[in-house]
């Protein structure tokens, strides 16, 4: 049972203008990546991710097409709750890969809903402070990174 959500006023740090990139192999695009900044004043373990939903151009991205990268390791979203040894520092981006065959060059409306459990704020057993790390922004697809 979570408490109310805490949201700091720094959405521009979550989805920066250069965050959306094409992900290509020799045969062509296989998807895209999205870099996500942490809108909080402390780092958190990756297992603190309670909910991650991505919508691009009003189309929800299915969970099975997403991999999350942190510290050089890849995780399906279903395994994030077990990634308690992986720490997400505030100055490092979380990278999401979406393997959907790619998207067109140009601007895209990106809506991220990312809810985090604040592991430093446990009010009672199973009752945590929650952080709303969500953001919406129009991003232009960049070349491969």
Locations of the language-model features?
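Terminal leader/tail segments of proteins
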Residues: 1-145
């Amino acid at each position: 049972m979570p408490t109310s959500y805490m949201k700091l006023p720094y959405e521009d740090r979550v989805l920066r203008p250069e965050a959306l990139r094409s992900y290509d192999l020799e045969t062509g695009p296989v998807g895209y990546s999205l870099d996500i900044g942490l809108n909080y004043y402390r780092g958190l373990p990756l297992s603190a991710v309670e909910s991650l939903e991505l919508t691009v151009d009003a189309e929800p991205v299915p969970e099975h097409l997403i991999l999350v990268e942190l510290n050089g390791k890849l995780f399906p979203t279903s395994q994030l709750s077990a990634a308690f040894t992986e720490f997400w520092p505030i100055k490092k981006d979380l990278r999401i890969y979406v393997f959907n065959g790619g998207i067109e060059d140009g601007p895209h409306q990106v809506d991220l809903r990312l809810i985090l459990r604040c592991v430093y704020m446990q009010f009672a057993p199973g009752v945590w402070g929650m952080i709303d790390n969500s953001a919406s922004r129009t991003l232009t697809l960049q070349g491969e990174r």
